[in-house]
Amino acid sequence: MLRRAAAVAGATAAAVVGWSLFESQWVEFCDEEVELRGLAPELDGLTIVHLSDFHLGTLSFNARTLERAVRWASERPCDIVAITGDLLSRRRGEPQLERAVSALEPRFGVFAVLGNHDVEITRDPFSQPTDASVVQSAGAVLLENESVSLSVNGRSVQIVGGDQSLGPYWSSLAGLADPEADLRILLFHFPDVVRYLPPEAFDLILAGHLHGGQICIPTPRGRVRLEHLRAEHWEGLHETRAGFLHVSRGLGTSFVPFRFLARPEATRLVLRSAGR
């Protein structure tokens, strides 16, 4: 009896590990429409590919999932690519990062911010800071508490990139928003930034960090996520007082190369005028 129970337990554990390795490569490609109140008609249909949390350089399938996401993004019309941090976990992933970012060719450019793994603000003792020049040489615009303005069909689109090193001063990001811009987008690694921003600070906020929990346990009351238990917005689209928030589950894994009930994700957001 004990041997049979041990054999069943061993087989179950092996199946879970095998599935978790498979799921870490099983990228979900999403097309989502985001209805924004007051969006100018000239900006209706603007497309943004949101990518996050590559965690390149680790012993994992992270580079493979990023390659698939880049290939998917390159096959679709895209105006802007937004990358919301944790690009690298080890410097040995720099060549993979350069290849991936340089292969992206959106109409108006690739814009990125750094995450906690990029600047060693992490529990990972082996994490190495990301060299900003690597991101820039690949063709991305790296935003660190600064903004750029784009002219899109005669309308002004402002993209603000926040640096998490602001710590308790995240609310100051609202001061970077241009009230005259027709569309204000914030790129920030942590979704919790919406708790610190004033009402209607931005029209659209893009974040990552949480990996959708990365490893989740199913229960009768829903999934229990083993990381960041106090998080309010785990994944997907949310209407918050600070602005419309999209949280990406990201493409990579951290600490362990597994995902369970939290597939990696690449999303193309199509902006629409609410009530059109």
Roles of regions detected by a PLM:
Residues 42, 46-141:
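Membrane-embedded segments
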Residues 122-140, 146-147, 152-188, 192-196, ...:
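Binuclear metal-dependent hydrolase catalytic cores centered on His/Asp/Glu-rich metal-binding motifs
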Residues 29-36, 97-99, 142-146, 171, ...:
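Alpha-helical scaffolding within the catalytic cores
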Residues 33-60, 162-188:
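Mobile, glycine- and charge-enriched loop segments
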Residues 1-42:
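N-terminal membrane-anchoring alpha-helices
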Residues 36-49, 140, 147-159, 180-183, ...:
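Beta-strand-turn-beta hairpins that frame and shape the catalytic cleft
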